[in-house]
From Swiss-Prot:
Skewed-composition ranges (Basic residues): 259-277
Ranges annotated as spanning the membrane: none
Residues recorded as bearing N6-acetyllysine in the entry: K758
Location of the RRM domain: 154-229, 283-359, 401-478, 760-836
Pfam family, one: RRM_1
Gene name linked to the record: Rbm12b1
InterPro entries in the record: ESRP, Nucleotide-bd_a/b_plait_sf, RBD_domain_sf, RBM12B_RRM2, RRM4_RBM12B, RRM_dom
Tagged with keyword Protease: no
Residues where Phosphoserine is found: S703
Protein's name according to its UniProt entry: RNA-binding protein 12B-A
Length: 836
């Protein structure tokens, strides 16, 4: 049900748009605003529902155009009587020389009022949303002494149009008449204000248009009055070609004149002087906050309702780089007002600020930004690219083709960075991973793109989460990239390939200058001569292809000393095979570490002697270009024909005291892949709990006649401990077999006191209830976690209890994860890690 509200205190300059804005959020039907004006600033507003009216009354005391307004509950009868009284007062005063025409207008208005009441939902008696004129007085701004029956010129002025009207609606309103052009007037914000000026083909057509005065367009009656050519030109139209328009023109020439005039209006500038422009600033606008990717085509699409070409658009440059400013020149005030109405329109995710500007101010701004010449700019830049490099393929010094990435994991690889920029065609030569003088990753990288456009698109990935961490991106130039010690791939391609071959496929994962020791970790053979203590600190520097840890390899200088000099005091227990931890007493072991290499045949010794014995004093660079697998060639197959059970039976027959040479031959499994676990030094933690009195047979050791090895399905006793508490979880250890994990290694020894090579479960407590397996894997990034081993724990009702269990590949990784990650947050909670 419609409810009428009476408003008092409306300012003189306020209109229906201001009233609707004041009641923003409430439903006011089309034609529901009726401005009476007068000394008290009276108006009536119709609301669609009682709830809207109640909320509107609560806004009493608000401000419209800095004027306080009061709201009262009214009715349709009161509104209608007030409008009738206002009309009667206007007719009673009369206009000079109006005569009976004024009475006719009153009767015409009454008939229109009755006709509208017959189908109107709320009996409005005035033109909807037009009311009387928007000045609030109800008086015409251009009063005329008498209403002419014939038009003086082909221009008519319309008032009271609906706000959503277009040119076609106006032509339909004047159906049967030749309309030459229509200009809809707008507010400063680009919205229609309900006025328009129409140009007809002749004065005869204009006289016919005057007869449409107070005719209805939809639910509104339109006021039609005589206009002028000056108004037409002032509002963006073009002057008539060939001087003044004749008063009378034959109707048979009207269609051709209409067509020519319409085309002429679109293709020509106004011949009127600039002094006639309503805007003192001219037809120039200043665009701010533009995206750097915006081009002239985008601006033409933004101002699609205007007549705009590329020559009218000017982008502002500073130091040969695009800024976020631009200037646009319009040909008429109509397009100018339309452009100003698009203020703060979003273009390419940025709100564009459109401000009016004068020609003088525009020229001053352009000269201020572009006063420096390119020659002077090149002299000012200390890091400019030389002409030689430019001829070899360098882009312009002003282009920013590189991205500087920070906050990456320290062991990130090029392949992972490529996945982050999956939408861009990058190769590994375009990615540079930064590392310190010891080769440890800094968690930073440089990426070069083929074009500046791709680099700017890639910069949009700033603050995106990558490998569980929010990375930071910054666009830099190639000169800034070279300050990091990085040279472009096409300038040092040969040097880069030599560096890549020297450490088995880009081992250092970065392409720095080889002459800079702080930039290259493994570029020359000298970088391999680190002390073993330094090499152990680089355990997390991963090989990009085989995940082979360079830091775990021993330097050739380790073999220059005798075994007695090389061994540390704590290594006395580890100089023999791990099998002898439970076979022989420590004092019965007679062979040194060097004798292990003498058990092989002479043919095998020649294969192993070249890199380890003969050339260890002066290792050439060729030995480091080949992979370590090439140095250790696979021995003949007859060395592996004997099973391990036969070896143990042979030792048992001799009472564990006279072991033959065959027992300590290097096994096939140890020579299969030289992984990091094969050359790993036994840590103090592994030997901390190995006393001499504990060198006894393990519980699960079987006699020589029995089957020694654990069945492949692991359905018997669990070799890793008791996992009965995992029955409520998802992780099933039965499906995980030795060798099924690429990072896990099953050793060939039986030293069960050292569990560093066993799968160790880690329990995570105080997890968020909504945590999933992916978040847990991101939390353990950088640690050797079996991907499919994440087991979220649930209660009997199937709800998560905030706990999970993951499996680590060895004891050292599990212990390091517990020490480093315990107390770290996962979401809003700090989790607690413990070994099981």
């Amino acid at each position: 049900m419609a409810v009428v509200i009476r408003l008092l205190g409306l300012p003189f300059i306020a209109g229906p748009v201001d009233i609707r804005h004041f009641f923003k959020g409430l439903t006011i039907p089309d034609g529901g605003v009726h401005i009476i004006g007068g000394k008290v600033g009276e108006a009536f507003i119709i609301f669609a529902t009682d709830e809207d009216a109640r909320r509107a009354i609560s806004r009493s005391g608000g401000f419209i155009k800095d004027s306080s307004v009061e709201l009262f509950l009214s009715s349709k009868v009161e509104m209608q009587k007030t409008i009738e009284m206002k009309r009667t007062a206007r007719v009673g005063r009369g206009r000079p020389g109006s005569g009976a025409s004024g009475v006719g207008n009153v009767y015409h208005f009454s008939d229109a009022l009755k006709e509208e009441e017959s189908y109107s939902g709320y009996g409005s008696s005035v033109n909807r949303d037009a009311g009387f004129h928007t000045n609030g007085t109800g008086l015409d701004l251009r009063p005329r002494k008498t209403r002419p029956l014939k038009a003086e010129n082909p221009y008519l002025f319309l008032r009271g149009l609906p706000y959503l009207v277009n040119e076609d609606d106006v032509r339909v309103f004047f159906s049967g008449l030749c309309v030459d052009g229509v200009i809809l007037l707008k507010h400063h914000d680009g919205r229609n204000n309900g006025d328009a000026i129409v140009k007809f083909a002749s004065c005869v057509d204009a006289s016919g248009g005057l007869k449409c005065h107070r005719s209805f367009m939809g639910s509104r009656f339109i006021e039609v009055m005589q206009g002028s050519e000056q108004q037409w030109i002032e509002f963006g139209g073009t002057a008539t070609e060939g001087g003044d328009t004749p008063r009378m023109r034959s109707e048979e020439h009207s269609p051709s004149r209409r067509i020519n005039g319409r085309h002429f209006r679109k293709r020509s500038h106004s011949k009127s002087p600039r002094a006639r422009s309503r805007s003192p600033l001219g037809f120039y606008v200043h665009l701010k906050n533009l995206s750097l990717n915006t081009n002239k085509r985008d601006l033409r699409n933004l101002f699609r309702d205007t007549d705009l070409t590329n020559d009218q658009i000017k982008f502002v440059y500073k130091d040969e780089r695009r800024t976020r400013y631009a200037f646009v020149m319009f040909k008429n005030q109509k397009d100018y007002n339309t452009a100003l109405g698009l203020h703060k329109t979003v273009l390419q995710y940025r709100p564009v600020l459109i401000d009016p500007v004068s020609r003088k101010e525009m020229v001053r701004i352009i000269e201020c930004y572009e006063k420096k010449r390119p020659e002077s700019l090149e002299k000012e830049r200390p890091g400019r690219v030389s002409q030689k490099y430019s001829q070899e393929g360098f882009s312009g010094s002003g282009q920013k083709l590189c991205i500087y990435i920070r906050n990456l994991p320290f062991d990130v690889t090029k392949g992972e960075v490529q996945k982050f920029f999956a939408d861009f065609s990058l190769v590994e030569d375009d990615i540079y991973l930064l590392c310190d003088d010891k080769g440890v990753g800094l968690g930073e990288a440089l990426v070069r793109f083929k074009s500046e456009e791709q680099a700017m698109k890639a910069e949009r990935l700033n603050r995106q989460r990558f490998l569980g961490i929010e990375v930071l991106l910054r666009l830099i130039s190639e000169e800034q990239m070279q300050e990091f010690g990085v040279k472009s791939s096409w300038l040092s391609n040969e040097r880069t390939q030599a560096c890549s071959r020297s450490h088995d496929g880009d081992d250092c994962s970065c392409l720095f200058d080889l002459k800079d020791p702080s930039s290259c970790s493994f570029g020359q053979s000298e970088s391999l001569r680190y002390h073993p203590k330094d090499l152990r600190k680089m355990g997390h520097f991963k090989h990009p292809q085989g995940y082979f840890r360079q830091s775990d390899r021993r330097s050739p200088e380790d073999f220059r000393h005798s075994p007695e000099d090389y061994r540390h005091p704590w290594e006395e227990h580890t100089s023999h095979s791990r099998e002898e931890d439970w076979r022989l007493p420590l004092e019965d072991w007679k062979w040194s570490q060097e004798d292990d290499f003498r058990q092989c045949h002479e043919k095998d010794r020649r294969q192993l002697r070249s890199p380890w014995e003969e050339d260890f004093r002066r290792p050439s660079q060729e030995h480091f270009r080949r992979s370590y697998q090439e140095h250790i060639r696979q021995p003949p197959e007859e060395h592996f024909r004997r099973s391990r059970e036969e070896d143990f039976r042979h030792v048992a027959d001799e009472d564990f005291r006279q072991a033959s040479d065959e027992d300590f031959r290097t096994s096939q499994e140890d020579l299969r892949y030289p992984t990091d676990e094969d050359f790993r030094r036994v840590s103090v933690e592994d030997l901390r709990e190995v006393p001499e009195k504990d060198l006894r047979l393990p519980k699960n050791f079987r006699s020589p006649g029995e089957e020694f090895w654990t069945p492949p399905d692991f359905r018997g006793q669990h070799p890793f401990g008791n996992f009965d508490h995992l029955q409520g979880g998802k992780f099933d250890f039965e499906k995980y077999k030795f060798g099924s994990f690429p990072d896990a290694k099953v050793t060939s020894d039986l030293n069960l006191n050292c569990v560093s090579d066993k799968i160790i479960p880690v329990k995570i407590s105080n997890l968020p209830f909504k945590a999933n397996a992916s978040e847990i894997l991101d939390f353990f990034h950088g640690y050797k976690v079996i991907p499919d081993s994440v087991s979220l724990q649930y209660n009997e009702q199937g709800l998560p209890i905030g706990e999970a269990i993951v499996a680590m590949t060895n004891y050292n990784e599990a212990l390091a994860a517990v020490k480093d990650l315990s107390g770290r947050p996962v979401g809003p909670r700090k989790v607690k890690l413990s070994l099981l």
